[in-house]
Amino acid sequence: MQVITDQKLYDRIWDKIFQEYSFSTQNEKWLCPDTEYAVYRFGSLWDERQDAIVNQILCRIAGAEMYALDWQHDCFLFNPNENIPFAYQYYDTARDCTVYFPTYYPNGDYHFFISKDWSTGLFGHPWRSELIVTGAALMQAISDAADDLNLEKLETAQ
């Protein structure tokens, strides 16, 4: 896991989210992926168990490097196989701040987890308690685990 400190890379990632996914914090339709996706509603807050289920799915489906994006906070390049602890944080002495790795549940902010090749992703909305899933294999895996994750499927769209 590493914090994305390269401002140009950070900006390119968020520019792609805004331009290609039509991300907006102001609109009813807050994210519009240009590929097939499924929308779920969270039935409850996720704990360490649900976070681990999602991480196991990402290890299987996404494989190697992914982006972990926390709206207006640090963003990361990570590998799900690192098994980063639930609600992980550490003190970054170089930047003199505490760094928080986002949980898969969007606990207070938008949390996005996207494969580095942009083929699969989890996009969480904090106030609407929604999860948008992209990528056929990830969509199927989340669908299969929906009961354990306490997710209600709202729609599938293209």
Q: Predicted segment positions?
A:
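Structured alpha/beta or helical-core interaction and ligand-binding surfaces enriched in interleaved
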Residues: 1-158
